[in-house]
Amino acid sequence: MRVILLGAPGAGKGTQAKFITEKFGIPQISTGDMLRAAVKAGTELGLKAKSVMDAGNLVSDDLIIGLIKDRLAEPDCANGVLFDGFPRTIPQAEALLKAGLEIDHVLEIAVDDEEIVKRMSGRRVHEGSGRIYHTIFNPPKVEGVDDVTGESLVQRKDDVEETVRLRLKVYHDQTKPLVEFYSKLEAQNGKPKCSHIPGVGSVEEITAKVLVALS
């Protein structure tokens, strides 16, 4: 079972990805991890990727597809994989298709932009311990202060509203069109099975919907 999990930053993909990999016993593969592993191992593709990155350039989709093919040939991928952060664009999805790498399921965790902005921009972190609070959903006892140490909480750069909205725009421009791309494929070929899962509610409720979609 090969699964692509789509959703905007802050939609809760990480939680559901953990559930899918544990429930179905499949690895989560990310292009970043594959690149680092190939470079470290000094494989032919790894050396090519290293020379591209050392020159300050982006690694081509063809090279990434080569890495994915190598990774899928490993024993732990025999029952399937969960793709993490790939494909991000239509050309990457087309490259997967051209390479004959079939996808069984495409899940979109859908959350309204304003809900995501509320979720992410309300996060506050205690840098020393990594404890995470939220101004609405999990506030500290005293505003802006860590419950344990009494030290100040900070807002990470990634959680600033302006940054969140920028990341959402990139998602809508580049990655959201994949939902339509795969829906058309499903209409034509009966595969992959595309599922739209509302990402609002308790973790258990969303997980139950994910399980139904993959069954």
Curated annotation (Swiss-Prot):
Residues 122-159 are annotated as: LID. It catalyses: AMP + ATP = 2 ADP. ATP binds at residues 10-15, 123, 132-133, 201. CDD domains: ADK. GO terms for cellular component: cytoplasm. Pathway: Purine metabolism; AMP biosynthesis via salvage pathway; AMP from ADP: step 1/1. One of its GO terms (biological process) is AMP salvage. It comes from the Bacteria. Disulfide bonds: none annotated. Pfam families: ADK (PF00406), ADK_lid (PF05191). Its EC number is 2.7.4.3. Its main location: cytoplasm. Residues 30-59 are annotated as: NMP. It is found in: Cytoplasm. Keywords: ATP-binding, Cytoplasm, Kinase, Nucleotide biosynthesis, Nucleotide-binding, Transferase. One of its GO terms (molecular function) is ATP binding. InterPro entries: Adenyl_kin_sub, Adenylat/UMP-CMP_kin, Adenylat_kinase_CS, Adenylate_kinase_lid-dom, P-loop_NTPase. It is an enzyme of class 2 (transferase). Coiled coil: none annotated. AMP binds at residues 31, 36, 57-59, 85-88, 92, 156, 167. Catalyzes the reversible transfer of the terminal phosphate group between ATP and AMP. Plays an important role in cellular energy homeostasis and in adenine nucleotide metabolism. Consists of three domains, a large central CORE domain and two small peripheral domains, NMPbind and LID, which undergo movements during catalysis. The LID domain closes over the site of phosphoryl transfer upon ATP binding. Assembling and dissambling the active center during each catalytic cycle provides an effective means to prevent ATP hydrolysis. HAMAP family: Adenylate_kinase_Adk. Monomer. Belongs to the adenylate kinase family. This is Adenylate kinase. It comes from Pseudomonas syringae pv. tomato (strain ATCC BAA-871 / DC3000). The gene is adk.
